[in-house]
């Protein structure tokens, strides 16, 4: 059987680059690596409601710059910036140094693979039928400009005794084409029957030139700086689309 390699790792240095961007001596490398892992785990847990997609960590000259890509930046910033100030202080304690925080809003969370996977996982935890959740996410992504999307769910689907895997695909998802801009996301739904894994691949187009920073440039054009109000709630557009579909069928 053919196995699916992680498309992000396969394209590192071609049209993707690392999310941790720093160099260190041999005796400092392990310490900084564990700091990065701790910072990412803490942020994902603490900012779960903000819809965090990516966390980029840079370390220029004994400082730490953390860039958070989120669908709802208002949750991170808080009222008059109170929450982000507290978050900055907590991260400074973890990294033992000065921390600069940048918050970037994701304007189209329906086409972000990580946010789509987390959205489906949350719906499965609320006992929404997995096929309905998958089809709704696929329709939203295609409507907002994705050239292809594939979603896998695996586990005890619907409470079945035997675990299995089901997947849906719409459009093109060329996993073997290295110049293809493939966004990949993974999430886990913790249900009463056990854990259900959700994987999402979204094809955004092709990057013809050799540019490891291609993803960052695309996100810069799609996203905007975070404001006090935060982003749109995920799930709003799919619900409106479902209502229109039901009206058309009636």
From Swiss-Prot:
Q: Which GO terms describe its biological process?
A: translation
Q: Which GO terms describe its cellular component?
A: cytosolic small ribosomal subunit
- Basic and acidic residues compositional bias, start-end: 230-250
Domain named KH type-2: residues:
39-107
What is the annotated quaternary arrangement, including any partners?
Answer: Part of the 30S ribosomal subunit. Forms a tight complex with proteins S10 and S14.
Q: Which gene encodes it?
A: rpsC
Q: What does this protein do?
A: Binds the lower part of the 30S subunit head. Binds mRNA in the 70S ribosome, positioning it for translation.
Keywords tagged on the record: Ribonucleoprotein, Ribosomal protein, RNA-binding, rRNA-binding
GO MF, one term, reads: rRNA binding
This protein is called Small ribosomal subunit protein uS3
**Similarity-based family:** Belongs to the universal ribosomal protein uS3 family.
